């Protein structure tokens, strides 16, 4: 260390290394290197080309080549993996015609609105139909056999509902007393309504309806005795009281079919019928020919008469006799819930022709049988001949062994009429349905 406190160092010579000398390549060596590089490139290019060719070949075989199929007996080439839809589109559907679009009732809406075509896969009896919705999902197999034909007709879109099916009405004939033998019950059926056409069609019954059946029978009282019912129409009138008096004197009973309009004008006589032990029934309100009136008017004719008779006598009947006896299946369908029975007759005295008291009497006596119902009148015209004939009729019938009863008593003596009909207490069951008529 010197006086300044520093170390002194000796200078040393440092030798710098010389660069290495690279031997220079000869021309032969350079040629060998170039040849090797070129060979590599050739091999590489050949390899790449081979890959490309292999890819193209694979793509061709796998994706682009055509495969043979048979359509309608003709050979057709189709791109591999094509669907049936592709095959059809690419061949203009082989010239077949589309089906039609039909309404729910079968009318043509569009000539070409149906299935575009129909396709079956396979040959002969082994051919299977292919649904149109599977055309785009089904691949055409090499060697496949197809039959392409005209498209099927298609029914328009529609709403389907289940609707009630109204019962019909059946009417027996041949008897003097008509009544409900079987109540009707609705069934059900399928209904289609077309979305385009608006048509509504019945597509089939689900449950059959039960028809309303109207029985028609004569009363046949059982036992050894004979019974007959005298009936009087069109009252009450000024002749009614005389007839009631004769019945009372003879201790006989009859059935009176009063008109509502007549009872409204003679309420005391309507009450006198009931008070005398006779049967009060309805001849409707205004003696209209019921098959010629509408449903509402028909029901009004029946109900108004019942109301009037009840107001006059205190008794509400259910028994009617339709004017002229005209009460068809249509009238029953429209009003079966209102009445117990419609009473016709077995013996027509034709008293309205005024044939004379003797003729009226002979008609009843000559035509009488057990269970018979005889038709006479206490209103609607001059009824003096009926009044004159009545005593002889009663006496003659009794001499022949007959007991005079009301129509309800006649049915009771028969023993086979429904009790609600006999008693005038018919009520339509809650599960019953009325027929639909025009």
Kindly give the residue locations of the regions a language model identified.
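N-terminal Lys/Arg-rich, disordered targeting/topogenic segments
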Residues: 1-38
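Hydrophobic membrane-insertion alpha-helices, especially the h-region
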Residues: 43-58
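Eukaryote-biased recognition of intrinsically disordered, low-complexity regulatory segments
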Residues: 56-76
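Short, recurring structural edge motifs at helix starts
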Residues: 72-78, 131-135
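LysM (lysin motif) carbohydrate-binding repeats in extracellular/periplasmic proteins that recognize
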Residues: 80-117, 121-126
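N-terminal pre-catalytic segment of deacetylase/amide-hydrolase enzymes
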Residues: 106-116, 121-128, 135-229, 238-241, ...
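Active-site beta->alpha N-cap acidic-glycine motif
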Residues: 199-293, 297-301, 306-308
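Catalytic domains of cell-wall/extracellular-matrix polysaccharide-remodeling enzymes
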Residues: 242, 264-265, 288-403, 407-424
């Amino acid at each position: 260390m010197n006086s300044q406190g520093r170390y002194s160092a000796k200078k040393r010579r440092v030798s710098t290394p010389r660069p290495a000398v690279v031997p220079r390549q000869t021309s032969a060596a350079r040629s060998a290197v170039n040849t090797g590089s070129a060979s590599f490139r050739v091999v590489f290019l050949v390899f790449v080309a081979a890959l490309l060719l292999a890819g193209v070949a694979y793509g061709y075989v796998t994706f682009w080549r055509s495969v043979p199929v048979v359509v309608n007996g003709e050979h057709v080439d189709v791109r591999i993996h094509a669907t049936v839809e592709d095959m059809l589109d690419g061949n203009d559907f082989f010239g077949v015609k589309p089906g039609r679009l039909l309404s729910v009732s079968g009318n043509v809406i569009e000539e070409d609105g149906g299935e575009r075509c129909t396709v079956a896969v396979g040959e002969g009896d082994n051919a299977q139909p292919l649904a149109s919705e599977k055309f785009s999902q089904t691949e055409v197999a090499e060697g496949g056999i197809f039959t392409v034909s005209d498209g099927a007709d298609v029914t328009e879109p529609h709403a389907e509902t289940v609707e009630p099916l109204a019962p019909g009405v059946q009417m027996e004939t041949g008897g003097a007393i008509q009544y409900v033998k079987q109540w009707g019950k609705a069934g059900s059926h399928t209904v289609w309504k077309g979305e385009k056409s608006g048509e509504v069609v019945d597509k089939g019954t689900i449950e059959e309806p039960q028809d309303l059946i109207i029985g028609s029978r004569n009363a046949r009282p059982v036992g050894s005795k004979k019974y007959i019912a005298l009936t009087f129409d069109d009252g009450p009138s000024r002749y009614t009281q005389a007839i009631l008096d004769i019945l009372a004197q003879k201790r006989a009973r009859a059935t009176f079919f009063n008109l509502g309009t007549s009872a409204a004008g003679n309420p005391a006589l309507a009450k006198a019928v009931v008070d005398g032990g006779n049967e009060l029934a309805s001849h409707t309100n205004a003696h209209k020919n019921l098959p010629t009136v509408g449903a509402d008017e028909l029901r009004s004719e029946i109900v108004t008469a019942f109301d009037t008779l009840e107001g006059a006598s205190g008794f509400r009947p259910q028994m009617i006799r339709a004017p002229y006896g005209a009460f068809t299946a249509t009238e029953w369908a429209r009003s079966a819930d209102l009445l117990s029975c419609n009473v016709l007759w077995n013996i027509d005295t034709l008293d309205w022709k005024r044939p004379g008291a003797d003729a009226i009497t002979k008609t009843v006596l000559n035509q009488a049988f057990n269970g018979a119902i005889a038709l006479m009148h206490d209103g609607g015209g001059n009824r003096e001949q009926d009044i004159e004939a009545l005593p002889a009729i009663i006496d003659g019938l009794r001499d022949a062994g007959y007991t005079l009863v009301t129509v309800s008593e006649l049915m009771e003596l028969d023993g086979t009429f429904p009790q609600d009909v006999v008693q005038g207490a018919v009520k339509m069951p809650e599960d019953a349905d009325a027929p639909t008529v025009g």
